[in-house]
């Protein structure tokens, strides 16, 4: 412990004031609403395994593994700062949120939402007129019914190219009202009904995930969405390192952290830049040992 604290002090001394006043820009915002969290946790259904935080974690994990910068944003945030907003399980839609999301998408933003969204208002009263309530026009769909699967049950869903995947937990029975289907259920009594949809709204797009897809299908869908939103990873190379960035008007600083127990090669794109913690130039095939950190100045 003493050695670690000593090392930290040395590193902070090396950094000086170089990173003071830097910002951490992100093109992606994940909407996390505490009222929504509490309302969903205390609802009596439709599935015991539906947890708001689990859904937030699943979406965040996708971006984290791709080294895509993300902000966790409240419902009253400035949505215009982002290219892509993810709002999973937006069960409670407060007054003003619908309008803010519509304005965001109209101007070219991409929105991702899905099952159990647009169910109640801020007083926890159910919206009348069908689901997803106030988000119905924005998503271009009407959800007639929600089928809750038992923990051991699975459904099958087919992409338009014929690729099939399994889904679990909840299955929205979706009617298209302007949106197009990206994938349809291929089993159960609602085979042929849309499971995942895409709707053009103004200059932007809304994606609605009406069921919980298996990991490979979820990654495939999110990859397509990220590409459409023109959101890019901080590094072009695939790496297990955590990479974050902080910027000033003049400089860009990359923070590389190896959270694994294996030695990992630093991506080639950083070769020739300066390691602020050592003052040395980053070499090609440079190794970052387990739990080591590099702060690189571009």
Spans of features found by a protein language model:
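Carbohydrate-binding surfaces of carbohydrate-active enzymes
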Residues: 1-298
